[in-house]
Amino acid sequence: MAVEFHLVFAVPFSPFTSRVIKNTWLCHLSKLIKTVVIVGGGIAGWLTAGRLAAKHQSHKANGLNVVLIESSNIPAVGVGEGTWPTMRNTLKAIGISETDFIRECDASFKQGAKFAKWCTGKDDDFYYHPLVLPQGFGKVDLAAHWLAKQGRVSSFSDEVCYQEAICEQGLAPKTIRTPEFSDVANYAYHLDSAKFAAFLQKHCQEKLGITHLVDDVTEIHSVEGEYDSEKGDICSVVTQNNGEIEGDLFVDCTGFSSLLLGKHFG
């Protein structure tokens, strides 16, 4: 059975990586995909690799072959990173333990965003964007009722959901007995990006059978396009130490350098 892919696409880091991959199935070219080559590591590269490998059983003999090529000349930067609640589904789909993830990536729960001194600039002025949806969301506009309320003293988020109160009390969105990835209140994560990338790499190699090459891509080869001036789909990349790497689908996870989409296709 042929799986529909466009033969190269870029995946910037985003909590919606799994959605990007899912939508890529709908592209117009049809080809039987046996080997996927991902150029670029980091969170974007390893999330992409993990999602594909877990979905298509790369750890089995007849599964999808996933190869990730990562340059050693790009240092890992350990900065704080915020995610969206959909990250929980992504981690679960890859087969990651939430407990291990929290411990090894210095992760903490994210329940929303609080914008201090939002309107007046005073210390007690703020705007909350919680991750729990307002009561009756999609059925009734509570904002109009809140605006019409005379002498209001509470914020909009406090009027329409309970998450602001949880945050102000310094409470977690779940208890110690709540199952992994389940919640009492909706949540995402804050984490150390360098530790998260290393954690994903270890899991993907040990549990999902992904091939990891630490190397630099020096050349990119395409099949002939429909017109003489057009570059066709990428068929292989040449690396400095491992030679030519062929594939059926190439994913650009090189970030701002955009090695495949930007520099090659331009």
Q: At which residue positions do the language-model features occur?
A:
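Acidic, Ala/Val/Gly-enriched low-complexity intrinsically disordered segments
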Residues: 2-4, 8-11, 20
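Glycine-rich FAD pyrophosphate-binding loop
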Residues: 54-79
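A conserved short coil-to-beta-strand element within the FAD-binding core of flavoproteins
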Residues: 213-233
